[in-house]
From Swiss-Prot:
The lineage of its organism: Eukaryota, Metazoa, Chordata, Craniata, Vertebrata. Its cofactor is pyridoxal 5'-phosphate. GO terms for cellular component: cytosol. This is Aspartate aminotransferase, cytoplasmic. Biosynthesis of L-glutamate from L-aspartate or L-cysteine. Important regulator of levels of glutamate, the major excitatory neurotransmitter of the vertebrate central nervous system. Acts as a scavenger of glutamate in brain neuroprotection. The aspartate aminotransferase activity is involved in hepatic glucose synthesis during development and in adipocyte glyceroneogenesis. Using L-cysteine as substrate, regulates levels of mercaptopyruvate, an important source of hydrogen sulfide. Mercaptopyruvate is converted into H(2)S via the action of 3-mercaptopyruvate sulfurtransferase (3MST).
Length: 413
């Protein structure tokens, strides 16, 4: 008799929630259905948007006979890495001028986080540092915990961030938790458009956060997935990152170009490394090269070429910033419209937090039972946390979504 399959005891894993939500949405035959769960931009017709500048650059690449499909270097396309880091740090960054910045092209922002996490687990503040505490915000993007756990970190903690009662930032709780963190702990910070809350610290609050982190010797690991996409302004969305440079921090910054270029399936990311001196950066990159070699070995070229071509050409760059502002402005408009409708309906509670928040997501304050009601009774798909993708709202579905939220809040406590 043949032995059972070697995979017979493998348990069925739980599906990734946000993708299951989209699958459920697709299978729903109800014509009223609305998908507010997907983490991607949608037009007012609820369609994905290929940025006009991206179409233009893709055509340019297709017609360039000098390009080929040879392997890129392990660390990625040099021009892309340089342009990406410059976008985060600014043209006049002292770190760039002093040549103490490095970049690693990665498979999206997740890949940048993972390469950074793997490096820190091996080399941060010595060797084999898997017991170093890693702090993530409460709440945070669910993959943060998973990535650092997979890299081997054994002590992942949360710092307070969201005040559910006032529906805003719990600054004092955040500062207290960082103040009490062991020295040299790693702290994951959302550079802008905090996911899932959409609530960001002000510049003054960032200064307080930096002050605590500096005297506790905490290591910042920025996640910058929405530069330009949050406020429509590239500089404003990078303010925190640039302030930390000015304060002399060494840090990592995981960058994603999925949202601000609409290149979701090209997996275009960059890990920017800021150190104290050029020689240290070279050593760090030499070790990261070893990590990349056993992870994906060489990154893909197409998305990196699109981003590098755009960022390095003044005319294309200007067109791109216009495209990004188009997306950011539509989201801001949808926020205002949703809030106005809920207030007009006299929906119980306060709704100013919808317009106080920025970026793609809004943390509505809806509880899991209300979310369940919206999914099952109204065919409006959103995460159990109450997070919605604001770009899933359109001029055609706004009234339906607002009245449905009103109904859920009124009927379900």
């Amino acid at each position: 008799m043949a032995p059972p399959s070697v995979f017979a005891e493998v348990p069925q894993a739980q599906p990734v929630l946000v993708f299951k939500l989209t699958a459920d949405f697709r299978e729903d035959p109800d014509p009223r259905k609305v998908n507010l769960g997907v983490g991607a931009y949608r037009t007012d017709d609820c369609h994905p948007w290929v940025l006009p500048v991206v179409k233009k650059v893709e055509q340019k690449i297709a017609n360039d006979n000098s390009l080929n499909h040879e392997y890129l270097p392990i660390l990625g396309l040099a021009e892309f890495r340089s342009c990406a880091s410059r976008l985060a740090l600014g043209d006049d960054s002292p770190a760039l001028k002093e040549k103490r910045v490095g970049g690693v092209q990665s498979l999206g922002g997740t890949g940048a986080l993972r390469i950074g996490a793997d490096f820190l687990a091996r080399w941060y503040n010595g060797t084999n540092n898997k017991n170093t505490p890693v702090y993530v915000s409460s709440p945070t993007w669910e993959n943060h915990n998973a990535v650092f756990s997979a890299a081997g970190f054994k002590d992942i903690r949360s710092y307070r961030y969201w005040d559910a009662e006032k529906r805003g930032l719990d600054l004092q709780g955040l500062l207290n938790d960082l103040e009490n963190a062991p020295e040299f702990s790693i702290v994951v910070l959302h550079a802008c458009a905090h996911n899932p809350t959409g609530t960001d610290p002000t510049p003054e609050q960032w200064k307080q956060i930096a002050s605590v982190m500096k005297h506790r010797f905490l290591f910042p690991f920025f996640d910058s997935a929405y530069q330009g996409f949050a406020s429509g302004n590239l500089e404003r969305d990078a303010w925190a990152i640039r302030y930390f440079v000015s304060e002399g921090f060494e840090f990592f910054c995981a960058q994603s170009f999925s949202k601000n270029f609409g290149l979701y399936n090209e997996r275009v990311g960059n890990l920017t490394v800021v150190g104290k001196e050029p020689e240290g950066i070279l050593r760090v990159l030499s070790q990261m090269e070893k990590i990349v070699r056993i992870t994906w070995s060489n990154p893909p070229a197409q998305g990196a070429r699109i981003v590098a071509s755009t960022l390095s050409n003044p005319e294309l760059f200007e067109e791109w910033t216009g495209n990004v502002k188009t997306m950011a402005d539509r989201i801001l408009t949808m926020r205002s419209e949703l809030r106005a409708r809920l207030e007009a309906l006299k929906t119980p509670g306060t709704w100013n937090h919808i317009t106080d928040q920025i970026g793609m997501f809004s943390f509505t304050g809806l509880n899991p039972k209300q979310v369940e009601y919206l999914i099952n009774e109204k065919h409006i798909y959103l995460l159990p946390s109450g997070r919605i993708n604001v770009s899933g709202l359109t001029t055609k579905n706004l009234d339906y979504v607002a009245t449905s939220i009103h109904e859920a809040v009124t009927k379900i406590q």
